[in-house]
């Protein structure tokens, strides 16, 4: 059986990206027909991509977006304004390309997969891009008992790793998102556990909570985290105590991307919490992550500060699903095309000064 030691042994194998290739990319960028560093984030993207894949850069043509869907027992405490049935309904709408992430991925030519890691309800129709990995029908109510067992948490993490291991032969890069009721509550509890920052700076309204619901959400998180003393736990123990199957699987997806040396785009608040936990297990994982857009959820600022990261899209979005991450894909494509195609001043002079 895959235990925690097996997971940590695997994670410890993750290496940092190649600094020699980063320097080669920097040299090439500096000789282009532009002022030094004038393309800002696009140059950063080129260097990160070079570090992961080597230089010269190849086009990242085959892109895969993975939405992880699960439900959370903490909904019993009134911390979400959405009914739990919403998870499977919206997930099926994604698969039919009529929910936002389905529309975006179709428009951008990105392959979409939805993973049922723990939805309460089943999607009864068959879809080729629906991955059935249900551990059980939602987590426990973490206010009353721990969200899941350590073994269930490990199963969710290894599921994420295995999905990337399987798909890495067919795809150049990945992005991920989530779908699940009350997962801003689980994410906020995890962020509170890692950083112990002021709860008012961490917890947002999620799907649209009232003032009363927001205060209840904060109270539930504080009391549960203090009861379990999550502040002294590692990422796996935290997830088992106050997390969700979706967050555990996303952590595994980040680990899998780093193990397979693939770029993976980080979306908003919930995706960023999973990324924070992954990086707490091996800092090298951060080398393979590209943080894309700044969510409207307040806790994302704490994560970005904690990891010393910046996003390059700010669109007042807080939908989830990975919608912000996939919108970054054309920017990445342009960055790679730029470094591969743009000429130096001397080359342009020789071409046209005739």
UniProtKB/Swiss-Prot annotation:
Catalyzed reaction equations: 5,6-dimethylbenzimidazole + nicotinate beta-D-ribonucleotide = alpha-ribazole 5'-phosphate + nicotinate + H(+)
Active site: 321
Keyword DNA damage: no
Keyword Repeat assigned: no
EC number in record: 2.4.2.21
Annotated disulfide bonds: none
One Pfam entry name: DBI_PRT
InterPro entries for this protein: Nict_dMeBzImd_PRibTrfase, Nict_dMeBzImd_PRibTrfase_bact, Nict_dMeBzImd_PRibTrfase_N, Nict_dMeBzImd_PRibTrfase_sf
Domain of life of the source: Bacteria
Family membership: Belongs to the CobT family.
PANTHER family, per database record: NICOTINATE-NUCLEOTIDE--DIMETHYLBENZIMIDAZOLE PHOSPHORIBOSYLTRANSFERASE
Name of protein: Nicotinate-nucleotide--dimethylbenzimidazole phosphoribosyltransferase
Organism for this UniProt entry: Fusobacterium nucleatum subsp. nucleatum (strain ATCC 25586 / DSM 15643 / BCRC 10681 / CIP 101130 / JCM 8532 / KCTC 2640 / LMG 13131 / VPI 4355)
Gene name, Swiss-Prot/TrEMBL: cobT
């Amino acid at each position: 059986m895959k235990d925690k030691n097996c997971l940590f042994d695997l994670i410890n194998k993750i290496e940092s990206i190649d600094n020699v290739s980063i320097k080669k990319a920097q040299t090439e960028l500096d000789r282009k027909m532009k002022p030094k560093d004038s393309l800002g984030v696009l140059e950063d993207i080129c260097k990160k991509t070079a570090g992961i894949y080597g230089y010269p850069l190849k086009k990242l043509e085959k892109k895969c977006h993975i939405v992880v869907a699960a439900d959370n027992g903490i909904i019993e405490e009134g911390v979400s304004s959405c009914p739990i049935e919403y998870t499977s309904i919206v997930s099926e709408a994604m698969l039919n390309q009529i929910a936002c992430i389905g529309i975006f991925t179709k428009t951008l030519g990105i392959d979409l997969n939805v993973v049922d890691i723990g939805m309460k309800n089943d999607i009864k129709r068959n879809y080729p891009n629906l991955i059935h990995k249900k551990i059980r029908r939602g987590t426990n109510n973490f206010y009353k008992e721990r969200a899941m067992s350590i073994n269930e948490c490990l199963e969710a993490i290894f599921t994420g790793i295995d999905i990337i291991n399987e798909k890495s032969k067919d795809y150049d890069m990945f992005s991920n998102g989530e779908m699940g009721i009350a997962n801003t509550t689980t994410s906020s509890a995890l962020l509170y556990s890692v950083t112990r920052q002021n709860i008012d700076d961490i917890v947002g309204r999620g799907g649209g909570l009232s003032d009363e619901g927001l205060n209840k959400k904060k109270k539930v998180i504080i009391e549960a985290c203090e009861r379990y003393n999550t502040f002294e736990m590692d990422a796996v123990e935290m997830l088992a105590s106050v997390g969700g199957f979706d967050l555990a699987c996303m952590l595994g997806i980040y680990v899998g991307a780093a193990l397979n040396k693939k770029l993976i785009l980080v979306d908003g608040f919930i995706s960023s919490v999973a990324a924070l936990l992954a990086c707490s297990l091996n800092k090298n994982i951060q080398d393979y992550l590209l943080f894309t857009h700044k969510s409207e959820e307040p806790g994302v600022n704490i994560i970005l500060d904690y990891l010393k990261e910046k996003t390059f899209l700010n669109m007042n979005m807080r939908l989830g699903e990975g919608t912000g991450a996939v919108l970054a894909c054309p920017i990445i494509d342009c960055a790679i095309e730029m470094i591969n195609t743009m000429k130096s001043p001397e080359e342009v002079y020789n071409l046209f000064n005739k």
